[in-house]
């Protein structure tokens, strides 16, 4: 089964989506959060050793109600997800 998920990219990951707009992505289900990151990298033609690809791998994937770790399955019912890069504060 394939679903379309709209990705909202924050911080340095905003460079993945044209003009900072939400980015639609076709995803084959079942898929984990790690599978989603691979699909994003492919869709954006990221070289594995690029800074943006490395940032994507360190980033969290979130919905309105939770954060998904790499081993979590992405529910078929989700239509929007956020890409959240690591941040530091002080």
Curated annotation (Swiss-Prot):
Residues with the 1-thioglycine modification: 90
Glycyl adenylate sites (modified residues): 90
Pathway this chain belongs to: Cofactor biosynthesis; molybdopterin biosynthesis
Record carries keyword Nucleotide-binding: yes
Nucleotide-binding is among the record's keywords: yes
GO molecular function list: nucleotide binding
GO biological process annotation, one example: Mo-molybdopterin cofactor biosynthetic process
Keyword set, alphabetical order: Molybdenum cofactor biosynthesis, Nucleotide-binding, Phosphoprotein
Function description: Involved in sulfur transfer in the conversion of molybdopterin precursor Z to molybdopterin.
Family stated for the protein in its record: Belongs to the MoaD family.
Subunit description: Heterotetramer of 2 MoaD subunits and 2 MoaE subunits. Forms a stable heterotetrameric complex of 2 MoaD and 2 MoeB during adenylation of MoaD by MoeB. During catalysis MoaD shuttles between the two heterotetrameric complexes.
UniProt protein name: Molybdopterin synthase sulfur carrier subunit
Species of origin: Synechococcus elongatus (strain ATCC 33912 / PCC 7942 / FACHB-805) (Anacystis nidulans R2)
Gene: moaD
């Amino acid at each position: 089964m394939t679903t379309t998920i709209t990705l909202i990219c924050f911080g340095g990951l905003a460079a993945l989506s044209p003009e900072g707009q939400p980015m639609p992505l076709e995803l084959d289900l079942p898929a984990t959060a790690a599978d989603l990151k691979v699909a994003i990298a492919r869709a954006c033609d990221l070289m594995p050793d690029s800074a943006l690809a490395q940032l994507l791998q360190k980033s969290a994937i979130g919905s309105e109600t939770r954060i998904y770790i790499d081993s979590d399955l992405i529910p078929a019912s989700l239509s929007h997800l956020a890409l959240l890069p690591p941040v530091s504060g002080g």
